[in-house]
């Protein structure tokens, strides 16, 4: 299977701490809290300098920037579960250092944007959340998991945990709004309107020089 990475990434710092190519298709997402209102750059340093020997596929800073630390084709070291991390895209989100580990509005918006992109590219039609640990791996029932199901940790914190249903609903709303093209409709593109015909003809020449051979001038009476 071929894998792609998110075009929403604005910072990349690939961590050496991963297991190489995953052994399962991507069908799950796991949201984590960093426990710190950090930047994507500082999180990248943490995942690269050996201080934690951990990683995630993506991270979101306090300011909403998105970083990539492990390419989607590879399994990150994030959830204390090999089976989970082989099938999940893992995302660390900057958060407060104390419970309930709240995240910023900018970080939350970027999280929803990133999840929508991940689902679209990997063929995940809907995010499903039932807060039920017994459904791990049953992705037709639930395809969101949390770190606390695999290790004695509070991650992702009560703030993000309580938002999982809302996050899934917003992502699913966006996924359902993809444009459906009507084969009986054509779309005309206008590049400009000029009072001077010479300017209009110059624009047509520029467009044709770029390969748009069907460009033409239309006169409109005001």
Give a label for each model feature.
Residues 34, 94-96, 190-194:
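Short strand-loop junctions, especially beta-strand C-caps/beta-turns
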Residues 179-222:
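Solvent-exposed beta-strand motifs enriched in subsets of small alpha/beta binding domains
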Residues 2-12, 18-23, 97-183, 220-222:
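Basic/polar, cationic surfaces and motifs that engage anionic cell-wall
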Residues 1-85, 155, 193:
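N-terminal catalytic cores of peptidoglycan-degrading enzymes
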Residues 28, 88-90, 143-145:
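Structural preference for beta-strand elements that scaffold enzyme active sites
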Residues 24, 51, 84, 100-108, ...:
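Solvent-exposed, acidic/flexible segments
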Residues 86-97:
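Glycine-rich, often proline-containing surface loops adjacent to acidic residues and nearby aromatics
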């Amino acid at each position: 299977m071929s894998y792609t990475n998110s075009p929403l990434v604005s910072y990349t710092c690939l961590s050496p701490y991963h297991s190489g190519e995953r052994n399962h298709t991507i069908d799950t997402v796991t949201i984590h809290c960093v426990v710190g209102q950090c930047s994507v750059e500082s999180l990248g340093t943490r995942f690269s300098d050996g201080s934690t020997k951990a990683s995630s596929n993506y991270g979101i800073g306090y300011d909403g920037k998105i970083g990539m630390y492990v390419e989607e084709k590879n399994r990150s070291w994030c959830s204390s579960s090999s089976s989970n991390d082989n099938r999940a895209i893992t995302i660390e989100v900057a958060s407060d250092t104390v419970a309930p580990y709240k995240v910023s509005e900018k970080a939350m918006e970027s999280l929803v944007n990133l999840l929508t992109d991940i689902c679209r590219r990997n063929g995940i039609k809907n995010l499903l959340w039932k807060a039920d640990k017994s459904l791990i791996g049953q992705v037709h029932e639930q395809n969101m998991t949390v770190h606390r199901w695999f290790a004695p940790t509070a991650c992702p914190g009560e703030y993000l945990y309580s938002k999982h249903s809302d996050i899934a609903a917003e992502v699913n709303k966006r996924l359902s709004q993809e444009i459906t093209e009507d084969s009986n409709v054509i779309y005309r593109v206008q590049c400009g309107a000029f009072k001077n015909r010479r300017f209009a003809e110059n624009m047509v020449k520029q467009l044709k020089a770029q390969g748009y051979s069907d460009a033409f001038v239309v006169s409109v009476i005001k």
